[in-house]
């Protein structure tokens, strides 16, 4: 996704948003 709120999405992209 493109939402930083989506921890599930960014967890794979950045891994830092998974908090």
UniProtKB/Swiss-Prot annotation:
Keywords: Allergen, Secreted, Transport. It comes from the Eukaryota. One of its GO terms (cellular component) is extracellular region. It is found in: Secreted. Belongs to the calycin superfamily. Lipocalin family. This is Dander allergen Equ c 2.0102. It comes from Equus caballus (Horse).
């Amino acid at each position: 996704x493109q939402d930083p709120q989506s921890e599930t999405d960014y967890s794979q992209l950045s891994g830092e948003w998974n908090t």
